[in-house]
Each structure stands twice: as C-alpha cells, then as structure tokens.
C-alpha cells in the first residue's frame, strides 16, 4: 500500500533553508510576514541569553551556599599619632619597652618542645569532630568515598536549585527544537544569543563551565 507522506501535513525539512515562513513549537506559531519572522528571531536570541543567565544564577547560588560562614575577624589598627608617640621605646630599638625581653630572663633555657601540644591538639580534634568527618589515609593513597555530602539538605536551597535546573532544561530543549527547524535565521539567532550571553555573563561563572557543560541545557 502506498503511503503519502504529505497527507498529514508538511514534513520536517532535513536541509537548511533561508525561508522566512517557519512553524515554531506549535501550529499556531507560523511566521507569515517578515515582521513576525524578525520578532521570532529576536525572541529566540533573548531566550538563549536568558538560558545563560539561568546557568550563571545557579552557579552563584551554589557558591553562596557552599562557602563557609566565618566569623568576622577584628582588624588590628595602628594607634593614633598622639598615642604612638606616648609609647615608651628605646631610641635604637624597633620594639617598645613592654615587648622587650626582661634582663632577668636567662638565655640558657630548655628548648621548647611542641610535641605535647601537637598531641593534645590532635586529641582535642578527635573529640570535637565526629570520626566520620576525619579522613585518615590508609595506605599510600588512602581511601575515598564514592558519595560525599558537601552541604546539608534544605527545602529552600535544594528546592530553588531544582526549579532552576528544570527551567534550564525546558529552555534548552526549546532552543534545540527551534534549531531543528533547519532555518538559517533561527540557527544564527540561537548561536548569537549564546555568544552574547557568554560575553556578558561568562565572567560570573566558573571558567571551566561554559555553554557546552550540558548539551540539553544549552
């Protein structure tokens, strides 16, 4: 039996063309004029830039949540000029008198041994931190775990990351379907959006992760 490929509509083109009449995503989105075609290309360009923005946003959130929160360390400041001149100090000595070694101190003192302090520090570390967090090497290279948890699970943090990852996948697949129309203008709009997005937002992401880190997302 002979089956007509054109009975169910226009087949998808398998070669690149420069036509301004394309059907994008669904049947109602068909560009019939040059103005609608230009607006479609502008939308795809902005969508590619937005996809790069989502990748940078997720990276920034991951960096923010994985950085350890350290307490504020007070900065040491020099004393004021008036107080600086009031500190007693010998004329040829770079140190004030209260920092100099007293004359009654003997030079023939026993050498300082730090072994006992290192041992006590190690014991203190073992009691303070759980044993599963202290990785001691076993053998020349030591043992490594396959699954390492680097942060705690949180609805706010992990939920936001999951939504961003799902949105990136949705936008990435939409761009892929748009390029599969084999239209030269659509291809140039998507690639141009990727280039401009990397040019504007690439410095806010990790250098080793570009647009090619995940083919489905970009």
Curated annotation (Swiss-Prot):
Keywords: Copper, Copper transport, Ion transport, Membrane, Transmembrane, Transmembrane helix, Transport. It is found in: Membrane. Induction: Expressed in copper depleted conditions via the regulation of the macA transcription factor. Its main location: membrane. It holds the Pfam family Ctr. The keyword tRNA-binding does not apply. The chain crosses the membrane at residues 37-57, 176-196. This is Putative copper transporter crmD.
